[in-house]
Amino acid sequence: LANGDIDLDAFQHHLYLDSEIESYGYDLTKIATEYSTHMNLFSEKIDSIDQLKDGDVIAIPNDPTNGGAALKILQDAGILTLKADSAFSPTVDDIESYNYNVKIEELAANTIPSALPDVTAAIVNVNYAIDYGFKMDDALYVGDLNEEPYWTLIAARTEDLSDPDKVAVYDKIVKAFQSEGTKKVYEETFGGYYEPAGWDEDLLAPYKNA
């Protein structure tokens, strides 16, 4: 997108895009939000969190944004407590205490589904959960990432937003995406993993009136 090979992208959440902009200086702008997701805790060895025992291993993604989200979900599940100032991207260093004497193992997100038999439980990214057929009903804990930093979004090059013709096209794309048809796909195809988020906010408004 930043190199001009494509006009829009629609895959990252706010935290990821903000991190990329900070790291690489991309001149990109958020033009719409897409959905919130559920990032869940799965296990092939236990049926409830209460069955966790000393020394059990919980795998989480090893990248900063998804790993941080996983830790917040483990806190919501009552497994551990994070430091009060850990915000939206905590690391394992931000773990203040454990309510269960478990070990956290950081793995590449794409390897976690296949590693599930080798650990006690694991937080699985939504895309891999869908690809591997993990159902929401089978989760030990359903993690709700319905907070704006975790919403996925559509982004454009900032320079293109000064072109009224491109803004008009982008507006049509956003309206087509934020539709009842998309909601139906979320419900019928993705098993409840995706939910519309932020559709009531028109992020293109400042550019349509420029």
Give the ranges of each region predicted by the language model.
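Short, glycine-/small- and polar/acidic-enriched structural segments
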Residues: 2-47
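Periplasmic-binding protein-like
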Residues: 66-75, 175-198
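A bilobed periplasmic-binding-protein/Venus flytrap-type ligand-binding module shared by bacterial periplasmic
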Residues: 38-49, 151-169
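Short amphipathic alpha-helical coupling segments at ligand-binding clamshell hinges
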Residues: 54-56, 165-176
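A C-terminal functional module that forms or caps the active site or interfaces directly
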Residues: 126-163
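Short helices/loops that flank or line small-molecule/ion binding pockets
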Residues: 1-7, 72-73, 93-123, 127-128
